[in-house]
Amino acid sequence: MTTKDNPNSFRHPVMFIIGAALALTLALPAHAALDDSNGTPSVTVGGGIAVGPLYEGSSHYAAFPSLKLKAVLPTEDWGTFTAAFPEGLRWDLPGLAPFGVALLIGYDQGRKERIHTLDGRDDYLKGMGNLDSTALVGAEVYWVLPNGRLFVRGLQSSQNRNYGGESLGRTAYLEAGVATAYPLSSTLTLDSTLYGTWSNENDMMARFGVTAQQAARTRFDEYHPGGGMRDVTLKLGLTWQWQPQLALEGGIKTYALVSDARDSPLTDEKVGAGAYLNALYRF
């Protein structure tokens, strides 16, 4: 059995993410904007295909359907309400500019030992058992700058979780970084998000741990990671507004695992990437 708990193991990645976030924010022009509602209600639906690892750290890649739903309702007195899939529900409270606070309700789909893909099912995690899905609750605080937005958001499972014959308690994680949107032309927009993720011990165990029961059923060694920095992630997206109501979007996501996540027996690749392509219709 391997157990790790190093509270200082995420210090240097955090400094990196803060420095990179500030550099990216200062590099973008002042007219970059993140709010796509334009003060009016909107509904966007779309779908396409996504390709990526089966889970963070996996060397097995597969194609998955990509679905996108987003409804935005700005109000004068109550802030802005957003419902999106797969992100969840968001309420941006009013009257705090240039700072902001948003209440969040999300969803963690868990992880199956047999993962469904467009090609069928992958049995790489057979014997690990299923991690049940759960609702997430949390909040985000952010600082809107002329050329981007710095944010910190935290989410926690709404119930205790069980995995591999053990009770994990409530899983929780914290993300901190910067998001920007840069209009390259009247029809082309470049979006970027750079952030680091910290997980509590329960969340790390759910994602990268191996219990004694799981070790007995699989080829993976027992492993109990500690809480700490989990990964650093960069997302880049390009949206082409083909018609006033029609758009195409594509992008990539790349991550680097750090700390105990790198050393998990479930981790085959410490750096991973994925891509997506969607067609969107906006009402």
Q: What residue spans do the PLM features occupy?
A:
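Cleavable N-terminal export/targeting peptides
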Residues: 1-42, 58
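Residues on the lipid-exposed face of transmembrane beta-strands in outer-membrane beta-barrel proteins
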Residues: 47-51, 67-73, 87-91, 137-143, ...
